[in-house]
Amino acid sequence: MQSTIKPVEYDRPVAAGTVCGVGQAWAKVPDAPSAEERAALKERIKALLVREKAVLVAHYYVDAELQELADETGGCVADSLEMARFGRDHDAQTLIVAGVRFMGETAKILSPNKRILMPDLDATCSLDLGCPVDEFSAFCDAHPDRTVVVYANTSAAVKARADWMVTSSIGLEIVADLHARGEKIIWAPDRHLGSYIQKKTGADMLLWQGSCLVHDEFKGIELDLLRAEYPDAKVLVHPESPENVVAQADVVGSTTQLIDAAVKFNATHFIVATDLGILHKMQLAAPGKTFIAAPTAGNSATCKSCAHCPWMAMNGLANLADVLERGHNEIFVDPAIGERARLPIDRMLDFAAAHKKRVQASGDLQRDQQLFANVGAA
């Protein structure tokens, strides 16, 4: 399997997480197969999934052909938490996780007795890399009076150090609840998402200074120029984006919430500030609508990610077939760490289930109002 080595720079917080430095990493991106190779690989993967009694769970950000395979074979295409939850509840004892390493770890934490395989164990995340557990633990130890809330995009060891784990779909509600109870918070690792939640809730939050390689590159000035070209377009923004991008959003939300907004908004054109991988699901969910990628670089500038995560791009048909054939690239989580990491995850799941019941009890109107609560307010 031929591949291209791509060097990657990412935010590497220093000075106890309060100042940004620069870290160096790499991504080994598989070269695209030919049309004939692609067709043969797809058929081989389908047969191997049956042979291995395995199920494929894929993130919205992996390439479209992997998302299609997951859908066609009874798997799942979703955000990281729903991937893990689907795998936990599925009968299959082998889960193939097409995504990045923390997603495989989360799946293993929720399904410790299942075999979790990944196409490439080196597929990582700038947020995970930028929050080493030893440094983060020291940061937490320096502020023992604060509740520790971490984003899903962290290692199992960092989750094990936390009181709560959250996703972008429920983080705001959880922090608002903690704030209402008078709790002060340590937030990690994404500074943009943390700042967004802090402004929306008024919570007392110390922010770790990590960022997502993809979302950090979206540019507010260039987005404003693009909006002038498409004045009727609605702007959909993931909250991992910088403040001057979020400020221009019609909807700020998680991947699933942005797809939902694309369906429900009475508009034909959308500017999308998140990973390009999501456009596949948006186009399926809202056929006939036009989706335009938000800009990641200004004039005469180059982009690091160009709106597609280089580590998500490490998932390909060839290495997916290979992992099914050989049964290697298995995810392991130390049982003691896994047990501790499950506590903040379960705490979030319980909160999310109770929150969902409250929203459903209040009816569809309030749910839609909640979805679009960020219109003009971000």
UniProtKB/Swiss-Prot annotation:
Origin species: Burkholderia lata (strain ATCC 17760 / DSM 23089 / LMG 22485 / NCIMB 9086 / R18194 / 383)
GO biological process: 'de novo' NAD biosynthetic process from L-aspartate
Main location: cytoplasm
Subcellular location: Cytoplasm
Cofactor note: Binds 1 [4Fe-4S] cluster per subunit.
Chain's gene name: nadA
Official protein name in the record: Quinolinate synthase
Enzyme class: transferase
Record-linked Pfam families: NadA
